[in-house]
Each structure stands twice: as structure tokens, then as C-alpha cells.
């Protein structure tokens, strides 16, 4: 394959695939993206939209590999929001330009000193009560401001799609449609005289990577799924709140992680994660709702929760397999290893929404380190496929 049609075929239209397509296109790479269903319809639109700098991974009272791997990401995203760098997010409004952490004052213990330490300077700030956000004005406790912020994931996907929409298609790919060789990849489409050729295959399909790894005979890396059981809350008294509650935590994870969203009915919806979601995977929906009410009464006692409407949402976080199924610290990019197709293939999981820029950086470096023949044309390649459409947030029909 001396002159392929494409530099790369990207599989998966969530945050990883769309960010990567924008990044590579801005560098002059000729790529298309294939999405099996709707853009962002897996994990991206079910995420809380937090762009965070790792403080929640340091709640044990010390910096960790996870907290430092992600520390620069808020600045990376703000660069994109300013229209600078390889991915242009200018014009995208954020849901909240600051995130907060709150706790009953007596429950922080040694974290009080850690939060005030030089190691966290510029990343967390204790606030005076007049500076508390509207959602915590009635809170009698300690509030910190973080450098983190929150994006509207639907608006984010729409902004990422805008400059590359002529390169994004819907196709539920099977292993039989792809054939790899030392020279690259061939994608066989119905009613086409010849296959579409590409130098590389970039798998960014989240949970969809798992079946593709098997279909392509790729032995390493492998995938793991870590489940969550999130909670959606509607209540007429809700004010916008974007905050971690760490009152009385006994392990380094927020008790509740709260984001606020338009519920599609003219009101505000709270979306709850944190320990509630990770511990809740073994609870039924009714048990999780009962437990969530107890946690809300404990953490947000100034609201009468008796009239709240609660629903739950189960999500699987797709990641590279880790020892004992633990949480990976960094975005993951690795060349495929196996006895199936020998074509150049990178397996990608951002592991967190915030780390999408880092994933794209890693892929761009890998491509630069292993140059391949330039495509026959630098014009957008029109495929005989329908366009992939953006998905919906999971509460839009709830």
C-alpha cells in the first residue's frame, strides 16, 4: 500500500474519537471517524462533564499518581476554549467555571492542613461565606474553590463535530470488514469496487473496543469495565450546584459529587456520583434511591428531600485492564499485540473525560515517530455511509 486513501481510520465517536479527529486534522492528517450508533451515546453523554485537576484523587491527604497525571488538564481545556492549540473549542460555554468542595468543618481532620499546604497552592482555595456559591449559601460549614470546571457534554460534542462533520460516519463495524497487512488497513464497504485504505487503525470506541479486539485477533491490551450507579434528582428547590461533599469521608473519594443540568422540563436536575455511585453498584434501583435520600439529608440538610423525584442510571467505565481491576491513572494508548491482523493499530482509552487532550497528544506523538506514506489526496474522503448523529443525555427522556 504505497499511497493509501487515509492516514487513519478512527473507530468510536465519543470524546476520545472526536477530540482525536480534530487534533489530527489540525496537524494535516487525513482521517475519517466511524461510529456504530450515536456520537457520545456511550460514556461521554453519561458523564458529569467535569474537567478536573485531580484534587479528588488526593483526598487521602497526599498527592498521588492519579492526582498529578491530570493536574494540568483544566489549563489544557481552557487553552482550547480560548481557541488556541490543536483543538478549537472557542464559543463553547461552560456550565460552571468553578467547582467546589464542601464539608462540615469538624469532619475534615488532617485534610485541612493538606489543603492549605504549598503542594496544593493554586489548585484549591478556602472561601469566606460571602463567596460561597448560591447552592451552598445555606450551608454551615467549610467550602473550598477548585480550579476545576464543568462542560455541557452535548454542547461539547456539537462543537467538536462542527469542523469535521464531513469526516464522521455511522457504521457498525465488524471484523470481517477490516483486513490488515504490514502496509496498512483495508475497509470493505458494500457495493464498492475497492476497499478504503488507511495506514493506521485507531480504536477509540470505549466499551466497543472489547469486541473489536477479539474480532481483530488482538491479544493485548485487554479491556476492563468498572461500573457506576449514578442518581438523577429533581426537586423544585434545587439551585445550581457543582461540588464534592466530603463530610465524614472514610476513604479518599467524595461522598457525593454533584453537577447540575437543565432537566429539559424548565427545571434543574442534580446528577450524583462519588461514593454513592461506586458503592451503589451492588444495590438495586430502589435500594440506591433510598440510600441517596439518606445521603442528601445528611450532606444537604437545608433542603426538605421528601418531595424529591429520584431515578438511577448504570454506567460502565471502559478502560485498559489493570491489576486487580483498579483505576488507571492516565490516558492509555498502546500498539496492538496479537496474531490476528498485523496492520498498525493503536488502542486508546482516555479513562477520564478530562484526559482527552493527553490521549490525542500521545497518538500524535506515536504517528510522528512512525511516519507512513502520504494519502493520495488531501481532500475529505466521501464514503457511501450515513452521517453519525449526536446522542442525547440520559436524562432527556427520563
What do these predicted ranges mean?
Residues 126-170, 275-276, 342-350:
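Helix-loop-beta segment of a Rossmann-like dinucleotide-binding subdomain
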Residues 49-133:
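Dinucleotide-binding Rossmann-like beta1-alpha1 core, especially the glycine-rich loop
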Residues 25-46:
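Glycine-rich FAD pyrophosphate-binding loop
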Residues 300-398:
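C-terminal catalytic lobe of FAD-dependent flavoproteins
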Residues 2-16:
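Beta1/beta-strand and adjacent pyrophosphate-binding region of the FAD-binding site
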Residues 203-342:
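Active-site substrate-recognition segment that forms the wall
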Residues 143-200, 204-210, 357-366:
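Helical element adjacent to the flavin cofactor pocket in flavoenzyme catalytic cores
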Amino acid at each position: 500500500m504505497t499511497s493509501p486513501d487515509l492516514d487513519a481510520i478512527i473507530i468510536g465517536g465519543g470524546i476520545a474519537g472526536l477530540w482525536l479527529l480534530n487534533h489530527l486534522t489540525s496537524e494535516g492528517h487525513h482521517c475519517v471517524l466511524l461510529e456504530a450508533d450515536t456520537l457520545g451515546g456511550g460514556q461521554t453523554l453519561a458523564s458529569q462533564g467535569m474537567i478536573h485537576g485531580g484534587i479528588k484523587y488526593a483526598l487521602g491527604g497526599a498527592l498521588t499518581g492519579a492526582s498529578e497525571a491530570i493536574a494540568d488538564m483544566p489549563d489544557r481545556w481552557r487553552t482550547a476554549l480560548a481557541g488556541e492549540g490543536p483543538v478549537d473549542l472557542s464559543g463553547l460555554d461552560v456550565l460552571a467555571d468553578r467547582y467546589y468542595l464542601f464539608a462540615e468543618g469538624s469532619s475534615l481532620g488532617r485534610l485541612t492542613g493538606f489543603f492549605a499546604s504549598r503542594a496544593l497552592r493554586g489548585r484549591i482555595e478556602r472561601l469566606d461565606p460571602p463567596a460561597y456559591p448560591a447552592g451552598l449559601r445555606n450551608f454551615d460549614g467549610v467550602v473550598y474553590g477548585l480550579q476545576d470546571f464543568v462542560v455541557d457534554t452535548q454542547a461539547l460534542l456539537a462543537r467538536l463535530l462542527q469542523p469535521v462533520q464531513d469526516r464522521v460516519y455511522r457504521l457498525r463495524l465488524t471484523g470481517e470488514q477490516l483486513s490488515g497487512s504490514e502496509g496498512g488497513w483495508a475497509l470493505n464497504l458494500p457495493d464498492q469496487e475497492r476497499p478504503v485504505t488507511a495506514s493506521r487503525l485507531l480504536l477509540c470506541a470505549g466499551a466497543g473496543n472489547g469486541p473489536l479486539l477479539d474480532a481483530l485477533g488482538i491479544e493485548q491490551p485487554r479491556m476492563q469495565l468498572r461500573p457506576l450507579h449514578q442518581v438523577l434528582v429533581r426537586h423544585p428547590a434545587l439551585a445550581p450546584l457543582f461540588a464534592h461533599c466530603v463530610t465524614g469521608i472514610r476513604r479518599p473519594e467524595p461522598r457525593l459529587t454533584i453537577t447540575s443540568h437543565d432537566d429539559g422540563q424548565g427545571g434543574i436536575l442534580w446528577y450524583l456520583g462519588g461514593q454513592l455511585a461506586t458503592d451503589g453498584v451492588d444495590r438495586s434501583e430502589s435500594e440506591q434511591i433510598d440510600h441517596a435520600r439518606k445521603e442528601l439529608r445528611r450532606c444537604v440538610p437545608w433542603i426538605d428531600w421528601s418531595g424529591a423525584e429520584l431515578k438511577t442510571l448504570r454506567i460502565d467505565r471502559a478502560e485498559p485492564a489493570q491489576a486487580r481491576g483498579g483505576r488507571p491513572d492516565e490516558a492509555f494508548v498502546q500498539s496492538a499485540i496479537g496474531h490476528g491482523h498485523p496492520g498498525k493499530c493503536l488502542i486508546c482509552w482516555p479513562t477520564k473525560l478530562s484526559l482527552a487532550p493527553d490521549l490525542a497528544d500521545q497518538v500524535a506523538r506515536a504517528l510522528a515517530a512512525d511516519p507512513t506514506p502520504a494519502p493520495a489526496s488531501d481532500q475529505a474522503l466521501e464514503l457511501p455511509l450515513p452521517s453519525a448523529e449526536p446522542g442525547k443525555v440520559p436524562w432527556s427522556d427520563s
